[in-house]
Regions:
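N-terminal core-binding DNA-recognition domain of tyrosine site-specific recombinases/integrases
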Residues: 1-38, 196-203, 218-224
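Active-site/catalytic core of tyrosine-dependent DNA strand-transfer enzymes
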Residues: 143-217
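Basic, Lys/Arg- and aromatic-enriched nucleic-acid-binding interface segment
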Residues: 16, 20-22, 35, 39-99, ...
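Exposed loop/turn and edge beta-strand positions of beta-sandwich/beta-sheet ligand-binding modules
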Residues: 56, 79, 107, 136, ...
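C-terminal catalytic core of tyrosine-transesterase DNA break-rejoin enzymes
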Residues: 17, 35, 84, 88-95, ...
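C-terminal secondary-structure termini that scaffold catalytic or DNA-interacting sites
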Residues: 108, 119-121, 125-137, 144-146, ...
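Short, contiguous acidic/charged loop-to-helix segments that flank catalytic cores in large enzymes
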Residues: 127-137, 191-200, 216-224, 262
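Catalytic-site neighborhood detector that most strongly recognizes the C-terminal catalytic loop/helix
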Residues: 53-54, 61, 117, 228, ...
């Protein structure tokens, strides 16, 4: 087994943090195998990964003002609903692209995350898969705004352009059950009105850059919308444990350290609340 080749192949499709975790898992696995006499040589000796892990401070999120300016610039654009939905639910990009109508319960006003979809450029194909981790399987209560976004798309779906590619049925292994599942492309919520197919992952970022320029704000990528959702949730008073479940994190540490950001406004508000409490104690 060429462990270096495996890590090198991951660099085009996976984040540095994922590659690092794979590197560590492989190292632990083979060390145990060697220690127990199953193999003579540790296959990870001399193996390195080069893709850097993005620092927490590099992760961007929008201020309240930037969020308003961005949404204003995005109004009327073909991807507005997708951007707005992530800001209301905290979905990952692949979870949003892979969202199908059967995952939405109109009566309970919930959205269930149970699959993902992404375009693999190296293989030139769409690939369905399970959510990122077992904790990523979750059911999210919909805000009125999120419900309205989805309802409008559902009520007008018969007018959308549909490509022959929507007849494609993709299969993937369900992480929770170990059984094969199907994703029917025609059942996807978000279909590009022009192409009749779902928009590819990278096309969202390209479109975002133009909207950022139009709004006069710093450019950001799709994942920043998820970070922004988390930050707004904490600012609104949501309990971190609740946010952890909504984001699909196994650990509260991930939620707090990576996705929750302290803004200047929230610091000022915190100090003001502290000062008010101090004055009240003085009588």
């Amino acid at each position: 087994m060429d462990c270096q080749m495996i890590l090198n192949a991951m660099e085009s499709d996976y984040a540095g943090s994922t590659i690092r975790q794979t590197y560590m898992t492989m190292g632990t696995f083979f060390k145990s195998a060697k220690d127990n006499g199953f193999i003579d040589r540790h296959p990870m000796d001399g193996v390195r990964y080069t893709k850097p892990v993005r620092a927490v401070d590099d992760i961007h999120f929008l201020t309240v003002d930037e969020q308003k300016r961005f949404l204003e610039a995005a109004k009327g654009s073909h991807n507005y609903a997708q951007y707005a939905l992530i800001l209301e639910t905290g979905l990952r990009t692949g979870e949003m692209i892979g969202l199908t109508w059967d995952a939405i319960d109109w009566e309970k006003r919930t959205l269930t995350v149970n699959k993902t979809l992404e375009f693999r450029y190296k293989q030139d194909e769409w690939r369905a898969g399970p959510p990122k981790t077992e904790s990523s399987y979750r059911t999210i209560p919909l805000t009125d705004t999120a419900y309205g976004i989805l309802r409008e798309i559902y009520d007008t779906r018969e007018y959308r352009n549909e490509s022959n590619g929507l007849s494609t049925v993709l299969t993937f292994m369900d992480r929770k059950t170990g059984q094969k599942r199907k994703l029917v492309m025609r059942d996807l919520v978000f279909i590009n009105w022009r192409t009749g197919m779902p928009a590819k992952n990278s096309s969202y970022d390209t479109h975002l850059y133009k909207l950022c320029d139009d709004a006069g704000i710093k450019r950001f990528c799709m994942h920043a919308l998820r970070h922004t959702y988390a930050t707004r949730a904490i600012e609104s008073g949501m309990q971190p444990k609740v946010l952890q479940k909504l984001l699909g994190h196994a650990s509260i540490t991930t939620t707090m350290n990576r996705y929750v950001h302290v803004t200047d406004d929230s610091m000022k508000e915190g100090v003001a609340q502290f000062a008010k409490a101090q004055e009240a104690q003085k009588g």
